[in-house]
Structures are given as structure tokens and as C-alpha cells.
């Protein structure tokens, strides 16, 4: 009998995830999919949380194509490109944001984070401002995808017409405009607000502490 490999388990788990979602992804179902007994999975993943950590890492490795700075990036283009790429990686699989939330980063993610921080610090950010910028954009991206994927799931579960409280004309117009724009536009606008805010903060820091490398 061929020995079960971790990558085989991860691939099967990702396929199963797309079919049943994170709540339906159990070690029992995964073992059945692989044609093995449950204890065989524990050689590689001691529990479901460890498996989810591995799935999150695989999602990023497979789909996060702008995780580290490129040669032509400045700090703005990197943060924007990184966020867009991260979002696409989470959207690539059902419940991708839920899988990622709360995961423990492995060695590849730590190396990526180090490269990101070094790039931002070389662009003039302090270490504290650099990590806060990265975490703010990460939290925003995960939250945005959580809402987007939850909305897709809930639409099918609720079915029919959901009774709503009366809406004022202003609130109705705002909701209609938001719905018409769609999640891509909402994400881009929120991301622009964050990056613009970081640029303004850099101006404040420059006025207080003097220019830093990378300031325009």
C-alpha cells in the first residue's frame, strides 16, 4: 500500500472543502475520500486545526502571486497589489477567509512577512508603522472576503424574500449604490482609503521627525 503523503491529503481536503464548506469538512469525510482510516491522517495532521493551518498555507502558495515586493514596486503599489492578490487567494476556495482566520503562520509565511517588513522599512516606514500597515490591510482583506463569502452562502440558505425593516430614502439610495457597485469596487475603495491614510500619516511623521527614505 502506498504511503499517504501530506500533499495528497491537502489536495483532497481542498477539493472536499469546495464541495461541503469548512463546517462540513471533517476528518471522517476526508478519510473516506482518501480511502483510509482516520488514524492515518493523524500521522500528518494531529487535529482539524492543524489541517486548516496547512490548507491556509496551501491556498496562499497556490494563488497569492504578489506576496512579496516586485522590482518595480514602490510602497503604495506593493500594498495595493499584495492586498488584491491576497483577496484572490482567499476567494479561490469556498470559505477561504474562514480557513485563513486564526491560522498560525508557518515558516514560509514568516519569511514572507520578513521580506514585506524589510521592504517597507527601506521605503521609510518605521518597524511599528510597517507592521501596523500590513496587519490593517490583512484584517480589512480577510473581513471583506468573510462578508462576501458569507453573503454568497446565506443567499442560498435563506431563500425567498427576507422581510426588511422600512428604509429611509437616503438609506435605500446608499444600499442600492453599494449593491450596484459590487464587492470588487467596495474592496478597491476601502483599500484606497487605507493607503491614502498611510500616505497622510507618513506626511505627519515626516513633519515631526524629518524626511525618511522613500518619502515623495
Swiss-Prot record:
Xref: SUPFAM superfamilies: Homeodomain-like, Tetracyclin repressor-like, C-terminal domain
Pfam families linked to this entry: TetR_C_1, TetR_N
Keywords, alphabetical: Antibiotic resistance, DNA-binding, Magnesium, Metal-binding, Plasmid, Repressor, Transcription, Transcription regulation, Transposable element
Residue numbers binding tetracycline: 64, 82
Keyword check for Transcription regulation: yes
Domain HTH tetR-type positions: 3-63
One MF term in the entry's GO annotations: transcription cis-regulatory region binding
GO biological process, alphabetically ordered: negative regulation of DNA-templated transcription; response to antibiotic
Binding site for Mg(2+): 100
Record's note on what induces expression: By the [Mg-tetracycline]+ complex.
PROSITE patterns from the UniProt entry: HTH_TETR_1, HTH_TETR_2
Function per UniProt: TetR is the repressor of the tetracycline resistance element; its N-terminal region forms a helix-turn-helix structure and binds DNA. Binding of tetracycline to TetR reduces the repressor affinity for the tetracycline resistance gene (tetA) promoter operator sites.
Protein name: Tetracycline repressor protein class A from transposon 1721
Species: Escherichia coli
Gene that encodes it: tetR
Amino acid at each position: 500500500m502506498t504511503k499517504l503523503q501530506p500533499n495528497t491529503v491537502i489536495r483532497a481536503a481542498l477539493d472536499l472543502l469546495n464541495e461541503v464548506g469548512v463546517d462540513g469538512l471533517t476528518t471522517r469525510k476526508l478519510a473516506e475520500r482518501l480511502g483510509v482510516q482516520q488514524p492515518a491522517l493523524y500521522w500528518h495532521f494531529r487535529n482539524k486545526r492543524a489541517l486548516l493551518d496547512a490548507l491556509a498555507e496551501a491556498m496562499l502558495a497556490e494563488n497569492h502571486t504578489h506576496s512579496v515586493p516586485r522590482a518595480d514596486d514602490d510602497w503604495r503599489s506593493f500594498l495595493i497589489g499584495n492586498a488584491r492578490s491576497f483577496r484572490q487567494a482567499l476567494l479561490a476556495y469556498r470559505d477561504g477567509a474562514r480557513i485563513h482566520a486564526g491560522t498560525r503562520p508557518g515558516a514560509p509565511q514568516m519569511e514572507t512577512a520578513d521580506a514585506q517588513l524589510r521592504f517597507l522599512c527601506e521605503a521609510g516606514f518605521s518597524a511599528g508603522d510597517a507592521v501596523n500597515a500590513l496587519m490593517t490591510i490583512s484584517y480589512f482583506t480577510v473581513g471583506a472576503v468573510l462578508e462576501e463569502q458569507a453573503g454568497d452562502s446565506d443567499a442560498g440558505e435563506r431563500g425567498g424574500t427576507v422581510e426588511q425593516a422600512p428604509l429611509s430614502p437616503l438609506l435605500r439610495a446608499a444600499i442600492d449604490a453599494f449593491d450596484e457597485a459590487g464587492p470588487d469596487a467596495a474592496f478597491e475603495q476601502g483599500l484606497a482609503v487605507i493607503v491614502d491614510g498611510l500616505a497622510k500619516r507618513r506626511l505627519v511623521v515626516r513633519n515631526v521627525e524629518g524626511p525618511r527614505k522613500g518619502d515623495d
